[in-house]
Amino acid sequence: MRERAQEYDASQIQVLEGLEAVRKRPGMYIGSTSGEGLHHLVWEIVDNSIDEALAGFAKSIQVIIEPDDSITVIDDGRGIPVGIQAKTGRPAVETVFTVLHAGGKFGGGGYKVSGGLHGVGSSVVNALSTSLDVRVYKDGKVYYQEYRRGAVVDDLKVIEETDRHGTTVHFIPDPEIFTETTVYDFDKLATRVRELAFLNRGLHISIEDRREGQEDKKEYHYEGGIKSYVEHLNANKDVIFPEPIFIEGEQQDITVEVSMQYTDGYHSNILSFANNIHTYEGGTHESGFKTSLTRVINDYARKQKLMKENDEKLTGEDVREGLTAVVSIKHPDPQFEGQTKTKLGNSEVRTVTDRLFSEYFTKFLMENPTVGKQIVEKGMLASKARLAAKRAREVTRRKGALEISNLPGKLADCSSKDPEKCELFIVEGDSAGGSAKQGRSREFQAILPIRGKILNVEKASMDKILANEEIRSLFTAMGTGFGEDFDVSKARYHKLVIMTDADVDGAHIRTLLLTLFYRFMRPIVEAGYVYIAQPPLYGVKQGKNITYVQPGKHAEEELAKVLEELPASPKPSVQRYKGLGEMDDHQLWETTMDPEKRLMARVSVDDAIEADQIFEMLMGDRVEPRRAFIEENAHYVKNLDI
């Protein structure tokens, strides 16, 4: 925990502006009024408790989803100040909950470091809740105040004596604001709670669900902090050295923590945080780390004669292959920029991170020559594969990005050139591809048949991936490029539809394609361009009429219902479609491709870390985690093709 700031009292609560606009324009303060915004309310309150932990005063935090989907957050910090705040003439706790930008975060007195720009937190949550109440446990007393839609109900009062210290906040999100949903997602909250436990070494933090039929509780506490985080991220991977490297230092009031470990895989996974906020877009702390890592490894390799004089320098891409790293900084005044305000902009952080990491990592390599040699050798192998991939890439470029005659996948393109209207169906097998070509709308639907199972990219290096014809044809058809040349704005289709058979092989091909998109074309997944077609599982024919039943866990019940509702004569016949090839072009269009009638599932990434681990477990080299997953989930299997 950081060095404690001085006393925390009413004089440290500063007021910047009023609260009127929050209910009129909630999106300006919490991003949206969808499920994302609803969950954001929780973090605004939790961040206040985390600030107490960062300052060294709180040791435990509890987050509770109450039976009515309201939220309670409990901490054992100092308790929000209850004295009179000079500017407002009201108790400090009331000021915190009723005045926008009031808090102990702006003057640097209450907190040396706080959770990003969350000074707006408490008052915004109050404004967007039908009711909120706060209990402050301080100086032997329990202080209580209640609010309705941001307005004070009663003056702050003492309701009992106590030997506890801390703050408890309970709020009910306002359904007038959150019109889409007021139902909390336990797993979503638990993921972030666990992340906060990793980022704040030694903190005890729990999440509990008290809703009927959903009761659950998870408690997190990691003495290893981000070192434990790296171990968690690499749980299903084969690592090159057993224990993650951990580096910590402080300069100019900026604390830098880095933990890293290499795996035998081909993908890097670098997560960066500033004041506990996940900086998805990176920033100066991440670039400082990357620059330093590349320079230190190259210097070490030359000094130890692990590379020859005329060997080409290892690039950043080379030294990051197979790397899992977490970079976490704490800064008194973080500046966030970028599209989603998740990119750290402070220029001094780059220098501090570079300097601190360089010093500690150089020392580590000198003291651990075996590990140092393993890291350099991995980088050199990556360099060879990169140069081979570069040659393959140049060959592909010379053929021209859109010369369809060069596509081994036999792309049947559409006539429209408007990417927003265009759809690319990736179809399993030539026979289904033929039906799809016949049945499609040629104006906006393109068909790319793929033969057999494509390469599992989770286990392959870039040069092997680019040598695979099916994958090359897909990259070329999309027009986005790949790897370092990838550009989502060049996508020729804004709907990429995976259309496979409803059997085990079809599911496998679908997973292989999703692995490819996630690992090498992730921006198209994040942009919402990837879909999975939902061809029917059954066709019930009676006379000239056909009723289709979609796949899903209730498919059998749906089929029984359809049969029950049909007249007994003429006798209906049931066909189970195992393959797309069993449908003619008219049926395929009607059931799976017609925008007016079809069902499609859009692929999204809600939790990138979990997605990363699932792909590694299902598609990676290690058998044990996969076997454990199968044993754990086998009882869910309903239809098994043997």
Swiss-Prot record:
The keyword Nucleus does not apply. Mg(2+) 1 binds at E428, D501. Its EC number is 5.6.2.2. Pfam families: DNA_gyraseB, DNA_gyraseB_C, HATPase_c, Toprim. It catalyses: ATP-dependent breakage, passage and rejoining of double-stranded DNA. The record marks K453, N456 as: Interaction with DNA. Pyrrolopyrimidines inhibit both GyrB and its paralog in topoisomerase IV (parE). It comes from the Bacteria. Binds two Mg(2+) per subunit. The magnesium ions form salt bridges with both the protein and the DNA. Can also accept other divalent metal cations, such as Mn(2+) or Ca(2+). Signal peptide: none annotated. GO terms for biological process: DNA topological change; DNA-templated DNA replication. It is an enzyme of class 5 (isomerase). Keywords: ATP-binding, Cytoplasm, DNA-binding, Isomerase, Magnesium, Metal-binding, Nucleotide-binding, Topoisomerase. InterPro entries: DNA_gyrase_B_C, GyrB, HATPase_C_sf, Ribosomal_Su5_D2-typ_SF, Ribsml_uS5_D2-typ_fold_subgr, Topo_IIA, Topo_IIA-like_dom_sf, Topo_IIA_B. It is found in: Cytoplasm. GO terms for cellular component: chromosome; cytoplasm. GO terms for molecular function: ATP binding; DNA binding; DNA negative supercoiling activity; metal ion binding. Mg(2+) 2 binds at D501, D503. Its cofactor is Mg(2+); Mn(2+); Ca(2+). Belongs to the type II topoisomerase family. Heterotetramer, composed of two GyrA and two GyrB chains. Within the heterotetramer, GyrA contains the active site tyrosine that forms a covalent intermediate with the DNA, while GyrB contributes the cofactor binding sites and catalyzes ATP hydrolysis. DNA gyrase negatively supercoils closed circular double-stranded DNA in an ATP-dependent manner and also catalyzes the interconversion of other topological isomers of double-stranded DNA rings, including catenanes and knotted rings. PANTHER family: DNA GYRASE SUBUNIT B, MITOCHONDRIAL, DNA GYRASE/TOPOISOMERASE SUBUNIT B. This is DNA gyrase subunit B. The lineage of its organism: Bacteria, Bacillati, Bacillota, Bacilli, Lactobacillales. The gene is gyrB.
